[in-house]
From Swiss-Prot:
It is found in: Cytoplasm; Nucleus. The modification Phosphoserine is found at residues 43, 65, 196. The gene is ARB1. One of its GO terms (biological process) is protein quality control for misfolded or incompletely synthesized proteins. It comes from the Eukaryota. It catalyses: ATP + H2O = ADP + phosphate + H(+). This is ABC transporter ATP-binding protein ARB1. The modification Phosphothreonine is found at residue 446. Pfam families: ABC_tran, ABC_tran_Xtn. The lineage of its organism: Eukaryota, Fungi, Dikarya, Ascomycota, Saccharomycotina. ATP 1 binds at residues 114-121.
């Protein structure tokens, strides 16, 4: 056999390699083909989940912001105050803020107000990502996402984040010295930050914050990957409070807290000595925490001094004066127009008419006083129902524990009842079983002993913290309700009216629900709840995401409803408006509170440890 040349040997080897790869590829393709069908459905779910995530982050498919902003820094680069002029904000082409101003002074605590869907969360995101020209030395933290799932316990998570923050500041000090020299004005606040962090006390201070937010000696050691979304939000909040950024942005921080934790957070934030911008729909909380208000209304940011009550009083006075000026000016305009019209061609009056027309033209050029645009007020309404004789819902000596923890009863020998006149508030710290009690009422959970009696015609309507999970966020509200209740009606106009009755109107009905605010999605859930025509309402944190006027409308609807109501809520003002009976859930039972909800709040405030 003649010898094979080296070049031919290489060619043969490459050919064999290609054939081997081809054969392997064929096997791979066959394997992939078998897996492809199984993975198809999963990949569609993943794609939908990613789409929803990107919409919530307000980013396009490439991860770029869907927001368009303008703003000019008017304060000094070295200042801890932030002053911006020419502030504008567009989201998906919709103007949210136009040519406005923003001033955030160090040490002040601002409440950001505005109706659902006006763009408060979008504005906070734009601030947090420095789409506005905020100096780099001002560190910013936005709380709008839970802590990441990890192997770290709640305590370790907060301490680790604090260590990262300390390292970040040390690196920034080093960078500032190299770039600006050791005399830089930026160094003093950085040294203050380092001193305030105090690594020797990391664990003890982190534990105080976590316990204040509702953790106990056991749950503080639980891994974040094993926590529910609500508890992960508390961990993220604890981290934010612990590292104390120069600019702290909190988007509805009380949404996942019980009354006790809300009181603790209110007391803590009262002492926050940096800059805070807070979105909250709890009037009581805003009154307790805020030194200033920013009203996001009519595409403008309007600043007010004082807390929410002070803002409400000042705004009412300003609007009253504005309407007086508007009416006076309109009378003057009508008088001028009437004179001009009556002047006709009379020679002696034509000159006067021209003079008055100039006055009118100047008034218009200078800008006429605009009438006050009233808030959009709509009324929640739960359909009236047939009255049922008592007992409608009764617990007789029940005891309950979860199967995963049979040695620890949540309830023992509990007696409790609900009838058509009930307006019951369940209060108490997280983990004592308030939501569990509602699930026992619905029959979702069954007690191990005792008896639960339900009237044969009772129809329970349930609103929970997880009610929004039923919504397909890739659909519009209009598409979703029509598809879900296709047996009721296929007519879009019918569903427009149904959603409109709960304050979701116009474009809010037709855009994908992932782009709606939490409050707007809540309105969809309430519209669905009303369709079921329940005669007893079980409401678990119904105010989450709702703006203050909407919460007032909800309170009115509950008071006008002729069925029974049981509410779990952290909103003291709602409970003050509706609760006739307050039951404190603790020590494995529910005990009637002899006093008002505000007296209960004062009791909690006395026990706060900071």
């Amino acid at each position: 056999m003649p010898p094979v040349s080296a070049s031919k040997a290489k060619r043969d080897a490459k050919k064999a390699e290609r054939e081997a790869k081809k054969a392997a590829a064929g096997k791979t393709i066959r394997k992939l083909g078998r897996k492809k069908e199984a993975a198809a459905e999963e990949s569609e779910v993943d794609a939908a989940a990613r789409e929803i995530k990107m919409m919530k982050l307000q980013q396009d498919k490439d991860g770029l912001s869907d927001r368009v902003v303008t703003g000019v820094l008017s304060s000094l680069e070295t200042s801890r105050d932030i002053k911006l002029s020419s502030v504008s904000l567009l989201f998906h082409g919709k103007v949210l803020i136009q040519d406005s101003g923003l001033e955030l002074n160090y040490g002040r605590r601002y409440g950001l107000l505005g109706e659902n869907g006006c763009g408060k969360s979008t504005f906070l995101k734009a601030l947090a990502t420095r789409e506005y020209p905020i100096p780099e030395h001002i560190d910013i933290y936005l709380l709008d996402e839970p802590a990441e799932p990890s192997e770290l316990s709640a305590l370790d998570y907060v301490v680790t984040e604090a260590q990262h923050e300390l390292k970040r500041i040390e690196d920034l000090v080093e960078k500032t010295i190299l770039e600006d020299g050791p005399e830089s004005e930026l160094l003093e606040p950085l040294y203050e930050r380092m001193d305030s962090l105090d690594p020797d006390t990391f664990e003890s201070r982190a534990a105080i914050i976590l316990i204040g937010l509702g953790f106990n000696k056991k749950t503080i050691l639980k891994k974040t990957k094993d926590m529910s979304g609500g508890w992960k939000m508390r961990v993220a909040l604890a981290k934010a409070l612990f590292v104390k950024p120069t600019l702290l942005l909190l988007d509805d921080p009380t949404a996942h807290l019980d009354l006790e934790a809300c009181v603790w957070l209110e007391e803590y934030l009262k002492r926050f000595d940096r800059t805070l911008v807070l979105v909250s729909h709890s009037q009581d909380f805003l009154n307790g925490v805020c030194t200033n208000m920013i009203d996001m209304r009519a595409q403008k940011l309007t600043a007010y001094g004082g807390n929410y009550d002070s803002y409400h009083k000042t705004r009412s006075e300003l609007e009253t004066n504005q309407m007086k000026q508007y009416n006076k000016q309109q009378e003057e305009i009508q008088h001028i127009k009437k004179f001009i019209a009556s002047a006709g061609t009379y020679a002696n009056l034509v000159k006067q008419a021209k003079s008055r027309q100039k006055i009118l033209d100047k008034m218009e050029a200078d800008g006429l006083v605009q009438p006050v645009v009233p808030d959009k007020v709509f009324s929640f309404r739960f359909p009236q129902v047939e009255r049922l004789p008592p007992p409608v819902l009764a617990f007789d000596d029940i005891s309950f524990h979860y199967e995963s923890n049979p040695s620890e009863n949540l309830y023992e020998h509990l007696n409790f009842g609900v009838d058509m006149d009930s307006r019951i508030a369940l209060v108490g710290p997280n983990g004592v079983g308030k939501s569990t009690l509602l699930k026992i009422m619905t029959g979702e959970l069954t007690p191990q002993s005792g008896r639960v009696s339900r009237h044969t015609h009772v129809k329970l309507g349930v609103y929970s913290q997880h009610s929004q999970d039923q919504l397909d966020l890739t659909k519009s509200a209009l598409e979703f309700v029509r598809d879900k209740y296709s047996n009721i009606s296929q007519d879009f106009q019918f569903w427009r009216g149904q959603l409109g009755r709960y304050g979701l109107t116009g474009e809010g009905q037709t855009v994908q629900m992932a782009t709606l605010s939490e409050g707007q999605r809540s309105r969809v859930v309430f519209a669905l709840l009303a369709l079921e025509q329940p005669n007893v309402l079980l409401l678990d944190e119904p105010t989450n995401g709702l703006d203050i006027p909407t919460i007032d409308s909800l309170a009115d609807a509950i008071n006008e409803f002729n069925g029974g109501v049981v509410v779990v809520s952290h909103d003291f003002r709602l409970l003050d408006k509706i609760a006739q009976d307050i039951f404190v859930v603790e020590n494995k039972t529910a005990t009637r509170w002899d006093g008002s909800i505000l007296q209960y709040k004062n009791k909690l405030a006395k026990n706060v440890v900071l």
